[in-house]
A protein has these predicted regions:
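Signature for HUH/AEP ssDNA processing cores
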Residues: 1-131
């Protein structure tokens, strides 16, 4: 099983909480664990006078995170203990993405990535803000 480091919020925490696998992350994302923070973030984004910096600060304080590329002793490039064989691509602000079909935005890109036969997809999910994807 491919394993990688999982860190508890805030993002300033550079020591991993534990080592996890794709199935554990999938279960956390699909469950209710981040629902309240996600809803609060999406409300914040819709608010007047909210800056990108406000949004980034909220995410940094309220969401745990993972280093899908491998296991680390600390969150630093030179602290890699074992590579997972995974690579995570982060697509931000894709509400205007248009593919070849009728689907557009996050849902269109998600469909295109999920059906790309040239890449093995381990996990594909919407980012907490709602207008991005993690692949």
């Amino acid at each position: 099983m491919k394993r990688f480091s999982f860190f508890l919020a805030p993002v300033s925490n550079v020591v991993p909480h534990k080592t996890v696998g794709i199935e554990q992350i999938y279960n956390v994302i699909r469950g209710d664990y981040y629902r309240a923070a996600t809803e609060e973030l999406r409300s914040l984004i819709q608010g007047e006078g909210v800056t990108q910096r406000d949004v980034q600060r909220f995410k940094a304080r309220n969401f745990d995170y993972a280093t899908f590329s491998g296991e680390f002793s600390r969150r630093r490039e030179d602290a890699l203990l074992a590579h997972s064989g995974l690579l995570c691509l982060d697509f931000d602000h894709i509400s205007r993405w248009q593919g070849g079909g009728h689907l557009q935005g996050v849902y269109g890109l998600r469909y295109a990535l999920a059906h790309d036969a040239s890449v093995d997809t381990a996990l594909l999910f919407r980012s907490p803000g709602g207008d991005g994807l993690k692949w």
